[in-house]
């Protein structure tokens, strides 16, 4: 008995509309159901592949809206025009709040198909059935991190209920964490043991290339499920520390293991022609000066993968000399020149040289663009030059968000002097995104070890593995996504260097005082959180959650210091949730959900309310910049 998809199309809009969180720029759900003429018999393997395709926690709207907010709230990025006094005010949002629903609809369809199969036939798909669950839990956490309670246990059930369930209840985050832990445990159990019906062992349907993450490898999916439990555990620390530690110990001692190495990492590519998205997200901005300075001071190779080089290669520097224009002071400090016949001639880069001298952040201060000491960072006219017979060109002295780390269709133009050649990198590359990795798992283990968990390795061992793996993982992503200057200098400037990871760099990095696992327990814990903060530079919600629950970066730190640009109590810790319309079938349920969480609904909410009205998992956590309070 297979239901016709057309029936589901009729009710889908009502169901989905009743479960959205976000206030505007909501995802378009109109095309989520397949034309019934294209389906004669549902295919379970296809539905799983479709679920993997619809897995998305790093889409265009996230980078354009939600991620941009959180990255500024946690002082990782600033707008290229500088911060203003309204940076803490919420506006349009998107890319988050209903992402789990996209995959849940397909999981529900699979459950329904299997329900009407012969038990032995249905058992052939047990692995596929449970492989949906790690995806759902991951996206569910992603949605609830900034919006709180959501429909889950009754969501997307309308096509399979009579009367149709059009008003799903909101499950609390506390309930969801328990549900998700149970679902992950079920996944681990099913994937690590034979599937048996009666006394007969049932062979499992092979996904092969239809699973473009792990090729249907049950052991890897079990590791993923086990590793995701750590993401729940760290979010539980301020509500039930003992339970969180117990979960971490169970994960570490589970016979299925955890993500360990490139072959296990949740690095997703959806196809050779899947470029993720093509829209510009340059508005994400530039890195903050304090973060870039920390990375450069410690020669952290990730600075080259996180951010773009600025436009001031040695030929551009020489063009500024030829035009009689001053270089930005912070760039001039790194230039060695000589005077020949009364003219400045570029000689070499000072200090550590290329590529390090090409990375600069912007000051993280309110209205910095209006302050005289920062003219070299924000006054565009200072970066414009022309040479005789050429058109004026602008050269940007700071680094920016590296768009090719999030989208494969991006054309990069190499900075050349006025009148110089036009050199472009226009190759489209299939996009690879990192969602959970060996580094993240080991950073969580290091944290839990310092908090008292009894784990197989020491906190130092986990920490050192994490630092090394994070660098290797970002180097791999940079290579896979072929970001500018990876593997090529474009043969323009003889003083240009590639950004590829070099032998010995990781060992040198781990020897730096700021990266060594040394000091008091509190100092070690801060280092773990700083590494989480850096590792999540391209997972903005995880970065936000880390800062929110740890209070790191913290004020007056000798590592990366929190800048007290405004009172921390005026920085949002959750996102706005729109008030339901009285005609909404879910009006009473949504209103009750807001009330039960203590949330003020609507738009234009005072930032201080978004700070004090916290999602459940955030209650009791330190304020921004205050440091850990365990």
Question: Which residues fall in each region the model found?
Answer:
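Membrane-proximal, proline-rich intrinsically disordered regions
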Residues: 25-79, 86, 105-109, 115-119, ...
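C-terminal functional modules
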Residues: 442, 449-453, 468-630
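Short, compositionally biased low-complexity segments
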Residues: 22-28, 72-83, 148-156, 484, ...
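Bacterial Sec-dependent N-terminal signal peptides
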Residues: 1-34
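Structured, solvent-exposed acidic/aromatic patches
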Residues: 42, 76-135, 139-473, 521-523, ...
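Beta-strand acidic-aromatic groove motif in beta-rich domains, primarily in extracellular
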Residues: 62-70, 148-150, 244-245, 542-545
């Amino acid at each position: 008995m297979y239901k016709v998809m057309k029936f589901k199309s009729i009710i889908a809009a009502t169901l989905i509309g009743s479960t959205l969180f976000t206030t505007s720029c909501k995802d378009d759900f109109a095309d989520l159901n397949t034309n019934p003429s294209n389906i004669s018999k549902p295919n379970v393997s296809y539905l799983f592949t479709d679920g993997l395709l619809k897995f998305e926690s790093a889409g265009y709207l996230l980078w354009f809206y939600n991620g941009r907010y959180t990255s500024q709230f946690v002082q990782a990025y600033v707008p290229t025009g500088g911060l203003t006094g309204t940076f803490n005010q919420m506006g349009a949002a998107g890319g988050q709040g209903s992402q789990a629903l996209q995959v849940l609809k397909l999981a529900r369809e699979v459950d329904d198909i299997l329900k009407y199969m012969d038990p032995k036939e249905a058992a052939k798909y047990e692995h596929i059935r449970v492989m949906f669950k790690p995806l759902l839990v991951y996206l569910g956490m992603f949605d609830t991190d900034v919006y709180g309670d959501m429909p889950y246990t009754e969501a997307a059930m309308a096509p399979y209920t009579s009367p149709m369930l059009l008003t799903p209840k909101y499950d609390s985050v506390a309930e969801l964490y328990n549900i998700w832990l149970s679902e992950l445990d079920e996944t681990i159990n099913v994937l690590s043991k034979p599937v048996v019906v009666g006394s007969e062992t049932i062979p499992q349907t092979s996904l092969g290339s239809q699973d473009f993450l792990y090729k249907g490898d049950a052991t890897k999916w079990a590791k993923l499920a086990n590793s995701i439990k750590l993401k729940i555990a760290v979010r539980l620390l301020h509500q039930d520390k003992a339970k969180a530690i117990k979960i971490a110990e169970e994960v570490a001692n589970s016979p299925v293991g955890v993500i360990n190495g490139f072959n296990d990492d949740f690095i997703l590519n959806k196809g050779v022609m899947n470029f993720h998205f093509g829209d510009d997200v340059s508005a994400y901005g530039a890195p903050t000066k304090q973060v870039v300075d920390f990375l450069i001071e410690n020669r952290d190779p990730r600075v080259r993968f996180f951010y773009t080089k600025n436009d001031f290669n040695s030929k551009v520097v020489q063009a500024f000399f030829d035009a009689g224009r001053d270089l930005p002071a912070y760039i001039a400090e790194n230039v060695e020149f000589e005077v020949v016949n009364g003219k400045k001639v570029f000689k070499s880069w000072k200090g550590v040289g290329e590529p390090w001298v090409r990375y600069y952040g912007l000051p993280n201060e309110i209205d910095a663009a209006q302050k005289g000491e920062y003219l070299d960072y924000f006054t565009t006219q200072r970066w414009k030059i022309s040479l005789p017979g050429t058109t004026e060109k602008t050269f940007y002295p700071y680094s920016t968000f590296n768009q090719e780390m999030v989208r494969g269709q991006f054309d990069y133009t190499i900075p050349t002097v006025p009148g110089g050649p036009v050199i472009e990198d226009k190759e489209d590359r299939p996009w690879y995104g990192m969602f959970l990795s060996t580094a993240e798992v080991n950073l969580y283990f290091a944290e839990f070890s310092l908090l008292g968990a009894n784990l197989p390795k020491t906190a130092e061992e986990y920490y050192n593995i994490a630092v090394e793996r994070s660098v290797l993982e970002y180097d791999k992503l940079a290579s896979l996504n072929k970001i500018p200057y990876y593997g090529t200098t474009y043969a323009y400037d003889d003083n240009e260097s590639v950004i590829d990871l070099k032998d010995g760099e990781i060992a040198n990095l781990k020897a730096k005082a700021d990266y060594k696992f040394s000091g008091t327990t509190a100092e070690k814990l801060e280092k773990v959180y700083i590494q989480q903060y850096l590792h999540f530079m391209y997972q903005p919600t995880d970065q936000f959650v880390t800062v929110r629950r740890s209070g790191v970066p913290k004020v007056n730190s000798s590592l990366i210091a929190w800048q007290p640009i405004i009172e921390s109590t005026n920085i949002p810790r959750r996102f706005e949730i729109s008030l339901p319309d009285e005609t909404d079938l879910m009006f009473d349920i949504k209103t009750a959900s807001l009330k039960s969480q203590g949330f003020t609904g609507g738009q234009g909410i005072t930032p201080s309310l978004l700070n004090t009205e916290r999602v459940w998992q955030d209650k009791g956590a330190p304020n921004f910049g205050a440091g850990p309070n365990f």
